[in-house]
Amino acid sequence: MSQLDRKILKRSERMIKLFNEYKGREIKDFPAPPFSKWLNYKIISVKRGEMELEFLVREEMANPTGLLHGGMQCGVMDDCIGITSTTLGYEGFPISIDFHVDFLGKVKVGEKVRVIGKVIREGRNIIHMTAEIIDMKGKLIAAGNSNLLKTNFIPDYVKVADEMSKDK
């Protein structure tokens, strides 16, 4: 294993540890971007390349029929893909370069849903990922896939994880 691979693996372990410290808690207390805090999801499970989140569908997330808005579904899955990508341990934050969504079901205001992000393939520059929204009965609401480009941008929560490792 190269020195770079070891560095990536250690950062992955730190990110997973940080996310596990927030497991079951509302994300509003996490050093996340404003949109993530607004979604106010909870981390249910996390491992390298995979994360499961849960959130309550609120009125401001609905379309005129009282169902989870399609644009919101895209945003939730993109956010899940983004935060899941940080478990890979790369120094920079991967950004979406495309995104495809299939809307397959519906969920009402007041219901909880789970969002599952997974890495399908890690390339040298591009990461292919998927996300699914499922209701609490396991019914698939939406499925999406995205390709992400590795960048040099370091988000605040990666900086927090890196600082935590310096304290020990």
List each language-model region with its residue ranges.
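Terminal targeting signals and extreme-terminal segments of soluble enzymes
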Residues: 1-168
